[in-house]
Amino acid sequence: EKELSIVEATKLPLLAGISTLSALKKIKDGAYFFKWTNDVFFYGKKLCGILVERAKNDFVVGIGINVANKIPDDIKNIAISMESDYDIDKLILKVVEEFSVYYKRFSEGKWSEIIKEINNYNFLKDKKIRVNIGDKIFEGIAKNIVEDGRLEIEMNGEIKLFSVGEIKIEKDYY
């Protein structure tokens, strides 16, 4: 297999996100969404977080899913668990299977199709958000995730593209 370029590697959190979302939907029906860049939401609350790190010439994808754990009271308004006993081995296998399917499509040059699918589950779409990057704060309306993985944000009638940043959703839109 060919080595991923840095540009391609920036798409791994999105690929892992849609793969995990797809696997979870096959295990438990419900309202799933993808929050750019690395979270899966279930009924408006965070169910899963994804972390991708480089290890020498490889990339390690970490996926944390709240399966049956009790959510502490202080974060119940923003986090959720699947609240059921699931066969963890089956869940892991389904996530790996879905990642393999999506990675194959990605390798075959079908990223445009995948990004459209991701946007179908875009949790931020049309929400008023605040993006923190260092000591700078940007506010606007989230739009689509574009081909290169950046998020479009409409600010003062103009579309700006963001590749990083901590996202806060204005409460009125959440």
Predicted regions and their residues:
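DPxDG-like acidic metal-binding loop motif
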Residues: 1-8, 12-16
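Long, positively charged amphipathic alpha-helical accessory segments at protein N-termini or as interdomain linkers
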Residues: 14-32, 42-174
